[in-house]
Amino acid sequence: SQHFRELFKRYVGVSPKKYLTTLKIQRSKCLLLHKEYSVTDVAYHLGFSSPQQFSKAFRKTIGLSPLLWRRAYMLQDESALSEKY
């Protein structure tokens, strides 16, 4: 197990845990674009043990909470649409 982690980090550049967390956070950004999914829904869907754990990982990776990221993205999207039309 330790050998696998060392090899993985050597070839990928990050630990397996960090790699999987990054994948989950990237996927969560897609799910957060759907207003029908709450942050709690997204957290459990991606296998986080709690919404708090998800929010902490998201904030550490992205720099914003999932809810603030969603709001900022939606505002940016609305702004782009209003400029276009």
Functional labels for PLM-detected ranges:
Residues 59, 70:
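C-terminal interaction modules of eukaryotic adaptor/scaffold proteins
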Residues 1:
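Walker A (P-loop) phosphate-binding loop of ABC-type ATPase nucleotide-binding domains
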Residues 4, 8, 53-54, 58:
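Short hydrophobic/aromatic patch on the recognition helix
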